[in-house]
Amino acid sequence: MEDKKIGIPLEGFGEAVRKAAAEGMVLLKNENQMLPITEKDQVALFGRCQMNYYKSGTGSGGAVNTAYTTNLIDGFRRYKNIVLNEELLKVYEAWIQEHPFDDGQGAWASEPWFQKEMPVSLELAKKARETSNKALVVIGRTAGEDKDYAAVEGSYYLTKEEKQLLETVAEVFEDTCVIMNVSNIID
């Protein structure tokens, strides 16, 4: 086989992929018209998967080579009118330096379903609320070949840490949105 494009992202598919992604998103609720985010909003991002974005699953689904991936932060920064809470982002960046992404050491289907989440104190959430009017909490999951979802915490169910994160943020922010960064089908 002489096809030299095997293993190389084919040009021209980016727009089709963006369209498929937009059409594949599901909005479950939009209470009080929290969405869309506008230039009037100042956004606090919570959850490590705002940075450590899941782009693929496990097993063969994890063997995805891309020219680049765009995490939530970089996606928001493309829109100059949306203000992110940079102080909170710095806290997450420092924590992630000390708690790097667990890729399962690259072994087949060994990446965990979820990543350890940064504890968010009520004080940190309140500090973020001083300069932000909306909160987005990103929860990440991966699964796939040789590592299907299971009815356990950290896979199909939220972990105790994720529940605590959601409770803390929702206590402080009236407008809180949960974004599920999942690498495949989940309900």
Regions inferred by a protein language model and the residue ranges of each:
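C-terminal non-catalytic regions of proteins with extracellular/luminal or membrane-system context
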Residues: M1-D187
